[in-house]
Amino acid sequence: MATARATICNKKGLHARAAAKLVKTAASFDARIEVIRLPRAGEEQDPEAKAGATSILSLLMLAAERGVDIELHGEGAQAQEALDAIVALVGRKFDEEE
């Protein structure tokens, strides 16, 4: 299993347009990707705070606002490439102008 971490750094967080871009990126690879919202300092991990990377609704339910760390788990032939692409997308603030 491939893993990676990223910090949501765009102003609006993981909103609908950003989630759609993440889904499009994830779907372009031969891999199954899970996104986990990590707790902030002092919070406990919510066992429900995970989503499949190809489900916009599930990603929106993570409520991942600016500053939230996410962990990505990937399985499949292109898992590492998929995670690298998603981490790059998040790092580019989902290609949004702020």
Annotate each language-model stretch with its function.
Residues 2, 31, 68:
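Residue-level signal for beta-strand positions within conserved beta-sheet cores that form or flank
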Residues 61, 65-98:
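C-terminal structural segments of small proteins and small subunits
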Residues 1-9:
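Short amphipathic
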Residues 8, 48, 71, 75:
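Generic anion/oxyanion-binding catalytic loop in active/binding sites
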Residues 9-65:
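Compact, glycine-rich, soluble single-domain proteins
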